[in-house]
Amino acid sequence: LACTSLGSKAVRIECALHTYLAVGDVDHISVSGLQGHEGEDFASGEKFVWRGEFVPSGECRKRFPRVSSAELHDKVWHRKIRLESTCGSGCFLWNPGSERCAGFADMEKDEYRRMFCIESTFAGDDAWRIKPGETRQLKMSLSEHPE
């Protein structure tokens, strides 16, 4: 993703590379690579330092501003998906959970169980400030490996 400021003033931009990853069952996944990193829960506004492996429970909207690589472990499909980002971007974890998913017109009521998002982002305090004529890039790669 590349953003260029074509105007005469600096602009502030938040961006994310969204991934809707298919998983065997959201109740049987975990995310590693977050240990010891500061994060924020967008649902509650709570800030925290993460300890251990992340296991989602219910609705998940968590941002880790200083995490540029992480791994999703899918225990049903016996695989891991590695996210790697460049440019010092953050990591956002998202799943709507059952209640929020039921309100989405474009998702089946139990579809949240078969997907999870692990995304590369620049948002909040880490949003880009792009000067006139400047271009900023966000790059992300995903790779799948047996586990």
Residue ranges and their predicted role:
Residues 1-5:
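Short, well-ordered beta-strand segments enriched in hydrophobic/aromatic residues
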Residues 6-9, 146:
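Short, acidic/polar linear motifs in exposed loop/turn regions
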Residues 7, 20, 121:
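Anionic group-transfer/hydrolysis microenvironments
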